[in-house]
């Protein structure tokens, strides 16, 4: 992280896991802190802050954020006389759109789930995953609400496989993330919609391993395993691999 402050008298206490900031204020005094973040280094965090908002006031940043959210959420118009229902809908849409989010620095650098530093040459890199169960409705919703960004999300998800994607968060995660089961189904859905144009040649073997790793020792896991096997079958068919398609189509019914 990197912090710009409006007064030099604020002295933070920093250790490996937390930042403690103590300060004295007069009545009605405002404190302005600008914080830049990076998954790579403090130097990258400083560059991000200076590039994005160093010359903007708090009010400018808040106004720009409000406009950006209104433009995104306003794509869906709700017709109802019940204002509570309308508020409920837009609140949930707002929550759904908060993740995943871009984590690459302005230089293109980002840290992967394996702890290594990568460089995104063209596309923004997304992180902050929670796919288990939300793959059913949230991600199809994002494909409608923000299709351009969604393509980048799916490309980032494909890159996650190349970093050795586990089902749960690793100790080296660059930002908050949780479960990523059923990424197979998420990528298949994007492919069916023409929203993923990456190569499956490298991905499919990694997906096979992930699907095989789901145990078959309870009814719910058997169903989840079967769904991923069906996804593998469909992806194999897209690649023209008829034998693999047939094999995993049969295995998808093991439940």
Regions found by a protein language model. Give the residues of each.
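Acidic/polar, glycine-enriched structural segments that form the non-catalytic walls/loops
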Residues: 1-126, 159, 166-167
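General secondary-structure propensity
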Residues: 78, 123-127, 232-243
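Aromatic-rich carbohydrate-recognition surfaces in CAZymes
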Residues: 127-236, 249
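Alpha-helical scaffold segments in carbohydrate-active enzymes
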Residues: 91, 95-98, 186, 251-255
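Catalytic cores of carbohydrate-active enzymes
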Residues: 227, 239-255
């Amino acid at each position: 992280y990197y912090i710009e402050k409006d007064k030099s008298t604020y002295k933070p206490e920093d250790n490996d896991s937390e930042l403690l900031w103590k300060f004295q204020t007069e009545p009605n005094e405002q404190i302005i802190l600008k914080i830049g973040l990076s998954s790579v280094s403090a130097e990258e965090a400083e560059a991000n802050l200076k590039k994005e908002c160093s010359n903007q006031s708090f009010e400018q940043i808040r106004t720009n954020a409000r406009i950006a959210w209104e433009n995104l959420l306003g794509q869906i118009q709700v017709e109802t006389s019940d204002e509570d229902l309308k508020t409920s809908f837009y609140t949930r849409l707002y929550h759904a759109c908060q993740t995943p989010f871009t984590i690459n620095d302005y230089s293109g650098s980002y840290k992967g789930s394996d702890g290594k530093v990568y460089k995104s040459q063209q596309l923004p890199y997304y992180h902050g995953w929670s796919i288990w169960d939300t793959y059913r409705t949230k991600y199809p919703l994002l494909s409608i609400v923000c299709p351009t960004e969604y393509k980048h999300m799916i490309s980032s998800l494909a890159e996650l496989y190349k970093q050795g994607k586990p089902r749960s968060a690793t100790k080296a995660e660059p930002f908050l993330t949780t479960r990523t089961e059923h990424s197979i189904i998420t990528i298949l859905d994007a492919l069916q919609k023409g929203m993923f144009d990456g190569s499956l040649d490298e991905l499919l073997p990694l997906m096979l391993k992930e699907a095989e790793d789901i145990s078959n020792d309870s009814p719910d896991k058997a169903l989840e395993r079967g769904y991923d096997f069906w996804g593998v079958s469909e992806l194999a068919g897209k690649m023209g691999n008829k034998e693999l398609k047939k094999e995993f189509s049969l295995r998808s019914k093991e439940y």
